[in-house]
Amino acid sequence: MADRDDERHAERDRDELVAQVSYLEKELSVLRRKLADSPRHVRLLEDRLQEAQTALAAANAKNERLVSALKEARDQIVALKEEVDRLSQPPSGFGVFLRARDDGTVEIFTNGRKMRVNVSPSVNVDELRPGQEVMLNEAFNVVEASSYETVGEVVMLKEILEDGERVLVISNHDEERIVRIAEPLRDEPLRAGDSLLLEPRSGYVYERIPKAEVEELILEEVPDISYSDIGGLNGQIEMIRDAVELPYLHKELFREHKLRPPKGVLLYGPPGCGKTLIAKAVANSLAKQVAEKTGRDVGKSFFLNIKGPELLNKYVGETERHIRLVFQRAREKASEGTPVIVFFDEMDSIFRTRGSGVSSDVENTIVPQLLSEIDGVEGLENVIVIGASNREDMIDPAILRPGRLDVKIKIERPDAEAARDIFSKYITPDLPLHPDDLAEHGGSPTATVNAMIQRVVERMYAETEENRFLEVTYANGDKEVLYFKDFNSGAMIQNIVDRAKKMAIKDYLENGSKGLRVSHLLQACVDEFSENEDLPNTTNPDDWARISGKKGERIVYIRTLVSGKKGADAGRSIDTVANTGQYL
């Protein structure tokens, strides 16, 4: 029984082992199949991993784009919100600050009303200045400081009131108004006659406007013309130096001798003889004398060149205003101790004899204005008036009387000696001289130049047939022959030299022969005479004679003695001559 049980147990164990072996064989077979499939599976997993990584990178890039778009959208929303808030704000107005009060409020002027308002804590009240613009919110409180007004009306200052903060001005319609002085003008010296910028609503003047038409009358500070540059006028130069420089340089001596210095000088004579040059040389000489007297390296003087016709204005009172401003400018400069020359060129054009009927009678108000200004110079040092004219007979006698234009100096046409002196200013030894001319004088440039000047002066001043210019008939029947020398001037001499130099340049360009020759000067002299032969044409020979410097018996007839280009002499009668407007 026991054996049978053992057999059954052994058989059962054997079956279990067989089953276990069969199971393991199956498992082994499965594992072998899986092992055979594992490389392909690994590759598949690797491919899936790479695809997943690529998808992840794309997702990250998309996420970044979304973040950027969201940020941009948020910024746009913020900007739009700010724009909406800004556009929805009420408009800000502007006002003009008047003054601050002790309680922290300020007074402003806006929309035609004077208001007392509060100030934002961001605005420093102590930095606000009268007349300054300020920005206002909807409650008219000051929230920001602005600048000053830059546009408005131009008015003329008439008077500064006693408080120094207000002025009396005159508008373009001759209306008087009292206005306040804004801060930018508080420290500037204001004078009657100044042009100011007015903002009419607030009543503040902000700026002084320079008058361009008056500034243009000022030619230069120190002219570069000296007495050594002027030839043939030594006597006149000595006279004007005595009249102008002595009183300025030796004030004590004049005061000791109770001698009043002259207030004005009149330079008169034919055109082109050096009147303007002398006036400029006076200013230059005074500047040098000031430098020596004060010990400075550079002297200073002012030369106010007033061109007569430029002063005239079609509006009533404008010419007089210009004259006042000119003398006001002279007083300003002279108050600094600087000599000032006020030079009126072509004085007869604006200061004609009153009531003469030869103009529009504008001189009836202009002449008194000048007289009052000249008389006003009496108590003012360092200012002298110099007038120049070639028709001194047309200037109002009140201007020429002693005490106004005290010294009268006639600038004559140059004689032969004066002409040599003038030529020496333009023909100098340092110029290129032709070798042939140099050889004739031993190679000496100085001797050559002197010989050239002597030859051309002899040609100009010879009373020969070829130099005969005019025959004039006087009212008493007398006749006189005038030569070209009778109409010579410094300007004509300069023109002759310029012509000769141009001829020398053309000769050098054409044939290579360089240098100035005496033949150039002689030919230039002939050409200059030929050009001027047709100039004495006028309906009134007597007026022409006065301008040309020929005074005396009235001239009734002029006949030219120079053969014209057509070879015919032509007598010119006062009844038949056409007025060309040209004068010799």
From Swiss-Prot:
Tell me which family the UniProt entry assigns to this protein. Answer: Belongs to the AAA ATPase family.
Q: Which residues form a coiled coil?
A: 8-90
Which positions in this protein are listed as binding ATP? G272, C273, G274, K275, T276, L277
Where do the segments described as Docks into pockets in the proteasome alpha-ring lie?
583-584
InterPro entries, alphabetized: AAA+_ATPase, AAA_ATPase_domain, ATPase_AAA_core, ATPase_AAA_CS, NA-bd_OB-fold, P-loop_NTPase, Prot_ATP_ID_OB_2nd, Prot_ATP_ID_OB_N
Cite the source lineage.
Bacteria, Bacillati, Actinomycetota, Actinomycetes, Streptosporangiales
NCBIfam families xrefs: pup_AAA
Q: Which organism is it from?
A: Thermobifida fusca (strain YX)
Q: What is this protein called?
A: Proteasome-associated ATPase
This protein's assembly is summarised as: Homohexamer. Assembles into a hexameric ring structure that caps the 20S proteasome core. Strongly interacts with the prokaryotic ubiquitin-like protein Pup through a hydrophobic interface; the interacting region of ARC lies in its N-terminal coiled-coil domain. There is one Pup binding site per ARC hexamer ring. Upon ATP-binding, the C-terminus of ARC interacts with the alpha-rings of the proteasome core, possibly by binding to the intersubunit pockets.
Q: Which PANTHER family match?
A: AAA-FAMILY ATPASE, PROTEASOME-ASSOCIATED ATPASE
Q: In which pathway does it act?
A: Protein degradation; proteasomal Pup-dependent pathway
Gene name as annotated: arc
Q: Which GO terms describe its molecular function?
A: ATP binding; ATP hydrolysis activity
